[in-house]
């Protein structure tokens, strides 16, 4: 295989053990290939108290507009027990038409396709193609996401960098390549409810105040009615309780407090502030004067957002349809991604590989999908800079 093929590039990246926060050689590999292709490359390191230092990569070729950004992350989640894998998690084994390894789909495979498409595009057009291409790559997406894309964007802005559009290579397709583009993401808000009672002996309930019935009352109030009915591009917002805790191993003691944690994935009807106010209103109405509670809402850096379907969305969808024969759905489903940060810099959409095995043992990608995704990204580049 050519060392410029997406398979060769993905194989090399997978062999870099870049579990967050380790760089593992992945950014060094990208920097070398991009530098050889004529990009200016920088690798800023960002820090914050209580979090590990993270190395990032910013590369650009061209000085004119428009500027198309390819974005992604080289960090991966831990592989778990290596013995559970059919092939080593960082071996990059190629078997029966599949490339195995942690990050194969999330998202070293996607980065390899972006790089392969860009190198091929530059081979055809040279450095004077009527615009600029940038790579915005972090090593802190699977971790706290504190010293990664959000700070890399601030760093780039301070240097006068401006972007027109961004394509983020997250694995957006549920089952087969070409199914789905992400044009937005739901927001995420986490909260903790604590109901305050008074500890006592179960044989003397009149001397105690059991917080558990009150907590159940409040929890029921939050899920009794839907938060909304969905919007044009989003499903209805969804609140799920993730834990209810009393921390009481004794069977003859009424506990002093009871706690519950919930998470809401919310649509563009809400901001974190308006949603928090609605949750508090429902809790206060249910509590009345009978239940003493406190509500702690964790600060959210995950707002709901939407990139309005426009000419850029159509351009990417057309490239996908030309290569796969299907028109992708425009979706806002799934979890959060670094698109939530990029949206403040420029319009961003996401399209990458099939995510069925991401974060799993034996994560793998079809070699044919690497070739097809590279062809799609190549079509995007051709159409973007010709238009």
Curated annotation (Swiss-Prot):
Alphabetical list of InterPro entries matching this protein: ArgE/DapE_CS, Bact_exopeptidase_dim_dom, DapE_proteobac, Peptidase_M20, Peptidase_M20_dimer, Peptidase_M20A
Listed pathway(s): Amino-acid biosynthesis; L-lysine biosynthesis via DAP pathway; LL-2,6-diaminopimelate from (S)-tetrahydrodipicolinate (succinylase route): step 3/3
Any one Gene Ontology BP term: L-arginine biosynthetic process
Catalyses which reaction(s): N-succinyl-(2S,6S)-2,6-diaminopimelate + H2O = (2S,6S)-2,6-diaminopimelate + succinate
Enzyme nomenclature, EC number: 3.5.1.18
Residues that hold Zn(2+) 2 according to the record: 106, 142, 359
Intrachain S-S bonds: none
Keyword annotations of the record: Amino-acid biosynthesis, Cobalt, Diaminopimelate biosynthesis, Hydrolase, Lysine biosynthesis, Metal-binding, Zinc
Cofactor info, note text: Binds 2 Zn(2+) or Co(2+) ions per subunit.
Enzyme superclass (EC): hydrolase
NCBIfam families assigned to the protein according to its UniProt record, in alphabetical order: dapE_proteo, PRK13009.1
Quaternary structure and interacting proteins, as annotated: Homodimer.
Family annotation (HAMAP family): DapE (MF_01690)
Function statement: Catalyzes the hydrolysis of N-succinyl-L,L-diaminopimelic acid (SDAP), forming succinate and LL-2,6-diaminopimelate (DAP), an intermediate involved in the bacterial biosynthesis of lysine and meso-diaminopimelic acid, an essential component of bacterial cell walls.
Name used for this protein in its record: Succinyl-diaminopimelate desuccinylase
Organism (species): Methylorubrum populi (strain ATCC BAA-705 / NCIMB 13946 / BJ001)
Gene name for this UniProt entry: dapE
């Amino acid at each position: 295989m050519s060392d410029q093929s997406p398979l060769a590039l993905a194989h090399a990246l997978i062999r870099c053990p870049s579990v967050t926060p380790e760089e593992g050689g992945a950014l060094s590999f990208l920097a070398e290939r991009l530098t050889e292709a004529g990009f200016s490359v920088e690798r800023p390191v960002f820090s914050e108290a209580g979090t590990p230092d993270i190395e990032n990569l910013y590369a650009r070729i061209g000085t004119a507009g428009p500027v198309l950004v390819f974005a992604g992350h080289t960090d991966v989640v831990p592989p778990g027990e290596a013995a559970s894998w059919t092939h080593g998690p960082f071996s990059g084994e190629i078997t029966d038409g599949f490339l195995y390894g942690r990050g194969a789909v999330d998202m070293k495979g996607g980065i390899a396709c972006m790089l392969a498409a860009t190198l091929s595009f530059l081979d055809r057009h040279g450095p004077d193609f009527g615009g600029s291409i940038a790579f915005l790559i972090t090593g802190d997406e699977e971790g706290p996401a504190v010293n990664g894309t959000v700070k890399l964007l601030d760093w780039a802005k301070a240097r006068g960098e401006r972007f027109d559009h961004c394509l983020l290579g997250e694995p957006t397709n549920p089952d087969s390549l070409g199914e789905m583009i992400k044009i937005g993401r739901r927001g995420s808000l986490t909260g903790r409810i604590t109901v305050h009672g008074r500890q006592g002996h179960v044989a003397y309930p009149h001397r105690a105040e059991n917080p558990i019935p009150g907590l159940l009352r409040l929890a029921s109030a939050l899920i009794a009615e839907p938060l909304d009915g969905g919007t044009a591009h989003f499903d209805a917002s969804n609140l799920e309780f993730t834990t209810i805790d009393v921390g009481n191993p004794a069977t003859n003691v009424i506990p002093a407090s009871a706690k519950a944690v919930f998470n809401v994935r919310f649509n563009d009807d809400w901001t974190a502030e308006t949603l928090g106010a609605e949750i508090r209103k429902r809790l206060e109405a249910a509590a009345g004067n009978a239940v003493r509670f406190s509500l702690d809402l964790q600060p959210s850096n995950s707002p709901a957002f939407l990139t309005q379907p426009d000419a850029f969305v159509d351009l990417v969808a057309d490239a996908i349809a030309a290569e796969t024969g299907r028109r992708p759905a425009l979706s806002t489903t799934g979890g959060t991604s670094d698109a939530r940060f990029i949206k403040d810099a420029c319009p961003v959409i996401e399209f990458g590989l099939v995510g069925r095995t991401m974060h799993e043992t034996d994560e793998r990608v079809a070699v044919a999908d690497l070739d097809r995704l590279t062809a799609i990204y190549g079509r995007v580049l051709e159409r973007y800079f010709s238009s």
